[in-house]
Each structure stands twice: as C-alpha cells, then as structure tokens.
C-alpha cells in the first residue's frame, strides 16, 4: 500500500518549510517504508508538495502514525497544511471487492 502526503504552504513560508524539510530528510527513515520525493509544484496560493511512501504490508497503521507525528512538526508554519492519503494499487482495490486481474 502507498501513503501520499500532499503538503501546501504559502510562498512566503518556503524558507522556513525548506529548513525544516532538510532537517527531517536527513534523518534515517523507518525501515518499513520507502519514500519517493518530495516533488513540488507552484500554484497561485503557494507551494504544493508530494511525497509517496511505499509501506510494507502490515505496517500501514504504524507508518500513518509516524508520518502524522513528522508532519505535526510543521504546524508552527502559518498557512501550512498536509493531507495524508491512502493509495491502493489496482490489485489491492480489486481484492477489496473480491476480484482480481
């Protein structure tokens, strides 16, 4: 299963978010997921960033709690928001319906 973090912040907070991100990205992540990203795009409202986490089976809850704690450190940034979304592969989604390819 994948988790995707979608972050948003105003352009004026980019330096603050960037410094925090550098500190966090330098830390050794848990061994139960692989991170891809971050990727960023710029909108009229500011910056939108995406990080994708490929989570080991059975560790989804642990990964979600860990990421929630990580992203909570950004709450001091004015205008910052994050949504952590659960993404299923087509095989995982079909399995929920009792189907398979």
Predicted regions and their residues:
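Short S/T/G/P-rich N-terminal loop/turn motif that feeds into the first structured element of a domain
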Residues: 1-66, 86-101
């Amino acid at each position: 299963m994948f988790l995707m973090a979608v972050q948003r912040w105003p352009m004026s907070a980019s330096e603050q978010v960037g410094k925090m991100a550098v500190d966090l990205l330098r830390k050794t992540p848990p061994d139960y997921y692989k991170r891809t990203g971050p990727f960023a795009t710029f909108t009229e409202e500011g910056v939108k960033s995406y990080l994708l986490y490929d989570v080991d089976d059975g560790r989804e809850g642990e990964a979600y709690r860990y990421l929630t704690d990580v992203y909570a450190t950004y709450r001091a940034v004015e205008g910052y928001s994050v949504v952590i979304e659960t993404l299923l592969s087509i095989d995982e989604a079909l399995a929920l319906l009792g189907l398979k390819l």
